[in-house]
Amino acid sequence: MVDNKQNVVAEFKLVLVGDGGVGKTTFVTRHQTGEFEKRYIATQGVNVSNMVLYTTKGPIRFNIWDTAGQEKLGGLREGYYIGANAAIMMFDVTSRITYKNIPKWHKDLTRICENIPIVLVGNKVDSKDRKVKARQITFHRKRSLQYYDVSAKSNYQYEKPFLWILRKLTGDPTLNLVEGIALVAPDTEHVMTEDQIKQLEMEQAEAMNLAQQGVLPDDEDDEFN
């Protein structure tokens, strides 16, 4: 079990942004009980989860800010963003509108936080009701952001956003985790099969190939709407 009171070599504020219901809180709380500390800051209307990751540079602490539903009230207070070292922007691949709102979240975020590492993640890729296909996800390419498919409930690619951010923040592209993140086991209905994972990887490879060829679909095309 991680001792959150221990000395760490670095500590960072990481903010989660995106529409309500996309799975931000589920994403944070996949850690097994005792692996993180959670506190509520009433003045900002946020939950902050304290998470320590063991890396090849030593233990590093993330203070992960989650909106606690405040995004449903028409936006977040500036204090939510101030002092952030990195961000994860999340949308739900089963909901087109949550992806269409990503530019708004990016604008709000970068207005306060310039030049911080930002990862865009498409959550719920375990769902058979996917609406936003890999080749339709183009915003990160236009803004030079990192993107990952994830599934909070199946733990698919859970560590990748954190590892990418850690490498950017430390300036060490070779940094790795020396211990895996302890996660709650996925429910049976959310366990992803090898075939599902292969299909996702194939679709991502196809999307990357199209991007390299300069063939990017328009977010406003008929198929997307």
Curated annotation (Swiss-Prot):
Compartments in which it is found: Nucleus
Protein name as annotated: GTP-binding nuclear protein Ran
Nucleus as UniProt keyword: yes
Lineage of origin: Eukaryota, Sar, Alveolata, Ciliophora, Intramacronucleata
Family statement drawn from the similarity comment of this UniProt entry: Belongs to the small GTPase superfamily. Ran family.
Region ranges (Switch-II): 69-85
Residue stretches making up the Small GTPase Ran-type domain: 8-172
Region feature (Switch-I): 38-46
Binding site for GTP: 19-26, 69, 123-126, 151-153
Assembly with partners or alone: Monomer. Found in a nuclear export complex with RanGTP, exportin and pre-miRNA.
Physiological role: GTP-binding protein involved in nucleocytoplasmic transport. Required for the import of protein into the nucleus and also for RNA export. Involved in chromatin condensation and control of cell cycle.
